[in-house]
Amino acid sequence: MWPQTSSHAEMMHWLATTDAALTIIGDPINPLAPRSAQNTMVTYCSSRTQNVCGGACTFYNGGATCLNAPNTNCLAATHNVGFCDRAGCGHSCNQLSTCGTRLDNGFCFTPGTRSIIVPPA
């Protein structure tokens, strides 16, 4: 069965090996911090080519928030998140756990995403 979320290790590996143009926001990544695994890590990107998510990507590490995510076409996260078709985390939203089109490396195809709900971990 396909896991709906990526593990911390899988997310770190993707970050270390991707050639995507990355913008990093939120808390600094500190693998030695005891609470670091409690943060939610979300990577959301502008492009999908076949089963690969990439292009311009943003990586978020932190707690509960609403992320402004215009032009998002795919995403991955270490906890279940919501993705919405309007800014401000409203209108029509879906959960990563119910991803309809899975992509490589734990990503989900999420065309039309404009914001992402990061719940408390």
Predicted regions, residues:
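Mature secreted bioactive peptide module from preproproteins
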Residues: 34-121
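N-terminal prepro-regions of secreted/extracellular proteins
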Residues: 1-41
